[in-house]
């Protein structure tokens, strides 16, 4: 297959151009590559790199820089629901290691487009076909950031997906269609709800399922283990409906994984006669199972409690001893949090 290089730009251009400007320039380069291999009808028809401007705005609103938040300890980001991979190839050009994750059976061209561009660019982007409506396993265990744009409403179980993503990344960009009212004018905005589309109701596409209200999307985000750092809507922000292409509203969000929590109250345990008592509370935040172990005076730790979230009493706290409660993931390979408990002597 013929390889075509994306045009190189000088360091001065990189410093003086916004990421959005660079993205639009690269989109033009990518179209040259695409049309050199297949006719226009073969390729995903919508622009994905125009979203860079919104992603930059979300990042700045949260006091972050788009590329900086992608450069973390895991050395990897992923573009989920990637169409032809334009965003992934753009991020790779800016020094990131990227996975493309999409379902070849629902992707616009069966991921053949992304694979064609990958070969033409001699890219190192990893392309994986994953059915996100299954009990999936992603190809790289942990990511610094995920890009999950325009895909949520194509999934049968958005709750499961967002909860699963919270277990493998710190940051996640999400965009999806939302609606302020039904087609006949009934208001959805005040309620945390989602509208289930008919199979041909929206864009004649039976892979469209759930259109959330603004309040419903924010409730979903909170319930699946995320903090909402920034949020913006574009399109018909006054009278959007679930299916009308002329009344289309999109929400863009920057999410941060909510950290696991572990606490003991009271701590220190008040002095008194007999053993003292504290109540240990925990929450994994992402729906996974956690395990609480306790070590007394530095001795071998023993299992104290387990579960997604809960409380348990420790009614054997003695003065002069130190109790360290340690919160692990389900297979005891990652320490999520810890708290030291003591008892007052008087």
Predicted regions and their residues:
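Conserved N-terminal segment of class I S-adenosyl-L-methionine
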Residues: 2-142, 190, 242-254
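Extended, solvent-exposed regions of the mature portions of secreted/cell-surface glycoproteins
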Residues: 259-346
């Amino acid at each position: 297959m013929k390889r075509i290089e994306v045009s190189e730009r000088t360091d001065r251009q990189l410093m003086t151009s916004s990421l959005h400007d660079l993205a639009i320039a690269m989109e033009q380069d990518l179209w040259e590559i695409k049309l050199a291999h297949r006719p226009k009808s073969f390729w995903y028809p919508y622009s994905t790199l125009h979203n860079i401007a919104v992603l930059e705005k979300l990042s700045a609103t949260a006091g972050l820089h788009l590329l900086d938040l992608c450069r973390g300890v895991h050395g990897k980001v992923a573009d989920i629901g990637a169409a032809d991979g334009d965003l992934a190839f753009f991020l790779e050009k800016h020094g990131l290691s990227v996975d493309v994750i999409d379902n070849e059976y629902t992707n616009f061209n069966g991921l053949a487009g992304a694979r064609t561009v990958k070969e033409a660019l001699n890219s190192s982007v990893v392309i994986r076909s994953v059915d996100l409506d299954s009990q999936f396993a992603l190809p790289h265990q942990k990511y610094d950031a995920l890009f999950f744009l325009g895909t949520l409403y194509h999934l049968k179980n958005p709750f499961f997906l967002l909860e699963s993503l919270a277990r493998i990344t710190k940051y996640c960009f999400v965009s999806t269609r939302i609606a302020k009212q039904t087609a006949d004018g009934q208001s959805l905005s005040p309620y945390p709800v989602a509208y289930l589309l008919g199979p041909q109701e929206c864009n004649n596409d039976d892979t469209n399922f759930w259109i959330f209200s603004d309040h419903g999307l924010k409730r979903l985000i909170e319930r699946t283990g995320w903090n909402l750092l920034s949020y913006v809507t574009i399109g018909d922000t006054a009278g959007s409906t679930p299916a009308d292409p002329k009344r289309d509203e999109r929400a863009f969000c920057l999410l941060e994984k909510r950290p696991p929590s572990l606490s003991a109250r009271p701590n220190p345990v008040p002095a008194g006669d007999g053993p003292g008592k504290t109540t240990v509370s925990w929450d994994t935040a992402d729906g996974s199972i956690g395990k609480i172990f306790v070590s007394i005076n530095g001795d071998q730790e023993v299992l104290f409690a387990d579960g997604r979230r809960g409380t348990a009493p420790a009614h054997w706290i003695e003065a002069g001893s130190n109790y360290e409660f340690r919160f692990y993931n389900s297979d005891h390979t990652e320490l999520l949090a810890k708290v030291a408990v003591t008892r007052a002597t008087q």
